[in-house]
Amino acid sequence: MSEKPRHAPLVQFPVVDDELTIGGLKLRHLAAQIGQTPFYAYDREAMTRRVRELREALPERISIHYAMKANPMPAVVDHMAGLVDGLDVASLGELRVALDSGTAAAEISFAGPGKGDTELRGAVAAGITLNLESAGELERLVRIGEDLGITPRVAVRVNPDFELKSSGMKMSGGPKPFGIDAEQVPAVLRRIGESGAHFRGFHIFSGSQNLRPDSLIEAQDATFELAYRLA
């Protein structure tokens, strides 16, 4: 009896003549071209195909954004920028790569806790959308906007009061370092209105590492219900 495979077959990287291939090229030949190992190799066609498959599975009105924390390599970002509707960054370094890709500032968002004043200042100056992680971050952002003479663009990252069931990484359903607790959001929204900042919407993320359709549908329903309740 043959041993059960430990992972799903890598159909995007087929084996030809007992050699793994990427982008139709054998790894041995790639290594010879590059002249050294180890190295990173990416298949643009595979990325294009996966984004296309995702678009075909979603309603047309849904926008797809690429989170650069997945892979901020400039060549990868440049290719993805031509496939998706926007980019999400988590540092000034990623922001520079995103802007260099030609993506419009209006289609770039900045998420993540612990943003320093240097990061907030750079994001406001660039004109991108900042996902607020706390009421204190909003106050710092307002002061920076006044200093630069630029009206900040903001979204509110909400820590939901529900969780994505069977999730490998839970980002909701209790105290978390990400986002503002749902019950505190109304006060933050009032302060945004008073400050004159441009409100762009909500960032609601309940978890990841979950491919169960029933859990995802339940979480999406709860997400829309929460957004309607807060709006």
Spell out what each predicted region is.
Residues 115-122, 157-165:
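Short, basic, helix/turn surface patches
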Residues 2-3, 8, 160-231:
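Active-site loop/helix belt of alpha/beta enzymes
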